[in-house]
Amino acid sequence: NPKHKNDLNRSIPFDLFGDLAKISGVKLYSLKVGPDFDQIKISPNEIKNLGSQITDFQDTAEAVSCLDLVITVDTSIAHLAGAMGKPVLLPFAPDWRWMLESDGSPWYQSMRLFRQQQLGEWSYPFQRISEALEVLSTKKQCNDELKFNA
């Protein structure tokens, strides 16, 4: 959301997600709600828009329940997925709730933090996320389609 006061810290270049889509076994789904989905310059073959099916937080929870893991910045979705026990990869986390000395969260045992080394520099955390997904994708076979009842 470009109008958010902390947008610089929360907006990740979409092409970094496209790189993740190239990992064998990885399928990307967007939970972004609102008219700005067209900002995503990744082809529909690489990312599926679930945001158009989401009308409330219950729908969001149902969509998250269908995912193997969630990659998000510090938003309500990070807290929802963490509370649901879903693995969460959080690439930027300087907020006090995320501490500074660990890659985990005392509140959400399934959450793993991938920290930037420099403000606004996303390549390092996404390289680490990519490495983590490579390991995870060899352990799990994914279905072709994700469907939930919204």
Predicted regions and their residues:
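Catalytic machinery of carbohydrate-active enzymes
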Residues: 1-150
